[in-house]
């Protein structure tokens, strides 16, 4: 009987987290401005493509929204289903998946970086700042957001498991690594061809676009 009730709780966490993740401010901003974020720029419904298509302010808004929606999903799962041991982890991971594969957008969403950060924030603000610092260091060292994102999808669950001893929870938190890696395979192909926009695009837009144009 307990197994059946736990199964329903898990399914509720998955559904709740997934639907919250499906909320896409990047798509809504694009629609308001007259473009489809799924087919424009880098064809990604996330903060980085919003920067490319709508500017830094819009991109920052999208990043913050995506972070906080994942944090809210985790907290909601923990509050509504306190008897389920891994409620916040399951809800948070489901939110990341919903963000990446939103049913309302034909399963063409973002790449999960900001939402992953929101899950970290739900665990601890201090750990969020630490993971953010590591992500920034990796990003600047590699000059590619894709490398930073995929790296953090591994570093975060390993850190969680190491510091808490809760490796079952860490295993749940590691689930997004697979879809995040798959989502970034084309980025890695472009990196190998020298066609991927570098992180320096954020402050050297014209220079970076010229480089891509020349290499194309």
Predicted regions and their residues:
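Loop-to-transmembrane alpha-helix initiation sites
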Residues: 129, 145-152, 164-179
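Transmembrane helix boundary and interhelical junction motifs in multipass membrane proteins
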Residues: 22-28, 72, 108-114, 130, ...
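Interfacial segments of multi-pass membrane proteins
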Residues: 51-55, 77-80, 94, 98, ...
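Cytosolic, membrane-interface loops and tails of multi-pass inner-membrane proteins
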Residues: 27-57, 189-216
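Transmembrane alpha-helical segments that form the membrane-embedded catalytic/substrate-channel core
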Residues: 19-25, 93-103, 178-188
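Nucleotide and nucleotide-moiety/phosphate-recognizing core
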Residues: 9, 13, 58-64, 68-103, ...
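N-terminal signal-anchor transmembrane alpha helix
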Residues: 8-33
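Short, non-helical or kinked segments that cap or interrupt transmembrane helices
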Residues: 36-47, 104-117, 144-152
């Amino acid at each position: 009987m307990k197994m059946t009730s736990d199964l329903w709780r898990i399914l509720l966490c998955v559904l709740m987290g997934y639907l919250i993740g499906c909320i896409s401010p990047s798509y809504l901003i694009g629609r308001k401005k007259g473009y489809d974020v799924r087919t424009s720029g880098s064809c990604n419904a996330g903060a980085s493509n919003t920067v490319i298509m709508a500017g830094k302010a819009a991109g920052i808004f999208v990043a913050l929204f995506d972070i906080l929606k994942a944090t809210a999903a985790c907290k909601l799962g923990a509050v509504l289903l306190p008897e389920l041991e891994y409620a916040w982890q399951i809800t948070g991971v489901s939110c990341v998946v919903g963000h990446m594969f939103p049913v309302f957008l034909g399963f063409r969403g973002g790449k999960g970086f900001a939402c992953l950060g929101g899950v970290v924030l739900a665990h601890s603000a201090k750990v969020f700042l630490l993971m953010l610092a590591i992500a920034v260091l990796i990003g600047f060292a590699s000059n590619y957001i894709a490398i930073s994102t995929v790296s953090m999808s591994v570093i975060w669950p390993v850190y969680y498991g190491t510091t808490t001893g809760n490796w079952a929870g860490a295993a749940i938190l590691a689930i997004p690594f697979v879809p995040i890696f798959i989502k970034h395979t084309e980025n890695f192909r472009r990196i190998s061809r020298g066609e991927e926009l570098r992180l320096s695009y954020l402050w050297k837009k014209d220079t970076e676009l010229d480089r891509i144009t020349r290499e194309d």
